[in-house]
């Protein structure tokens, strides 16, 4: 006769530390799992990781532009690199003449001016994915948890898009009575999409790394 060991109750599983071996949270009822992650997930550090990923991506792009000079327009290099960074997220930079506020906005795209546009498009995605993987490995050390990956992607994506929206007020340039700045609607759409997708994928990659480490 086979004797089964007693299984932990839902309450015992929920109170167990994140990542503890033998805790099968995916078997818990959905409402219990949601409550668990809302109460225990490190939301603020995840938001901060999203902030940091955006800043790191911008600094990395700025260093790349300085090391390998691109044919960007002269002057206001930090602002123009910021425009390029937003362009890499598929966000257009719009310009409205201050003399005619109701005129049709113009657009600015620096990607055609660089040698390899695809490389610059990949840069923010790679930085954000790696940041999410590292965050998962250090702060949310769980294995095979879709809930953890979604929570990480949502939190980091929110932090990422919030600082990107703030950046639309910082990265502005007035040229010949035309005020240029990244599109805020485009920032909400594309940057949030980048944050969610790369945040989830990075978290799943971090979980794979955790599984590999535990097997060795």
Residue ranges of model-derived segments:
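Generic alpha-helical secondary structure signal
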Residues: 8-14, 62, 90, 164, ...
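Haloarchaeal acidic low-complexity proteome signature biased toward cell-envelope/secretome components but also
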Residues: 1-55, 145-147, 208-216
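An almost-null, non-specific background feature
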Residues: 10, 68, 72, 94-95, ...
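Hydrophobic core segments of alpha-helical transmembrane domains in multi-pass membrane transport
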Residues: 49-65, 128-134, 163-169, 198-202
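Long, glycine/tryptophan/cysteine-rich extracytoplasmic
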Residues: 50-122, 173-190
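Cytoplasmic juxtamembrane regions at transmembrane-helix boundaries
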Residues: 34-37, 115-158, 216
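Alpha-helical transmembrane segments of multi-pass integral membrane proteins
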Residues: 3-5, 139-216
